[in-house]
Amino acid sequence: NPSSPPVVDTTNTTSYPPMCSQDAVGGQVLENIPLQEDCLYNFNTVPYIVGIIPEDIIPVAIEK
């Protein structure tokens, strides 16, 4: 979509255990603890709650 802003920051989430990438450095402490998070749920709800991003921009994490 030409009206969408460019992606300015990405994180390779395939290099880490199953967890969302909000705090990759802090998350390394938890590497040995079995975690599962629904990143799609977290990315789509948290920014709207705290009002970080405009409503027309929806960050989505896709895990393979």
UniProtKB/Swiss-Prot annotation:
Q: Out of the domains of life, which is the source?
A: Eukaryota
Tell me the GO molecular function terms: hydrolase activity
Where does this polypeptide localize? Microsome; Endoplasmic reticulum
Q: Name one GO biological process term.
A: fatty acid metabolic process
Q: Which reaction does it catalyse?
A: hexadecanoyl-CoA + H2O = hexadecanoate + CoA + H(+)
Q: What is its EC number?
A: 3.1.2.2
Give a Gene Ontology cellular component term annotated to this protein: endoplasmic reticulum
Sorted alphabetically, the keyword list is:
Endoplasmic reticulum, Fatty acid metabolism, Hydrolase, Lipid metabolism, Microsome
Q: Member of which family? A: Belongs to the type-B carboxylesterase/lipase family.
The subunit field of the Swiss-Prot or TrEMBL record says: Monomer and homotrimer.
Function according to Swiss-Prot or TrEMBL: Hydrolysis of a variety of CoA thioesters of long-chain fatty acids.
**What is the name listed in the Swiss-Prot or TrEMBL entry for this protein?**
Palmitoyl-CoA hydrolase
What is the protein's species of origin?
A: Rattus norvegicus (Rat)
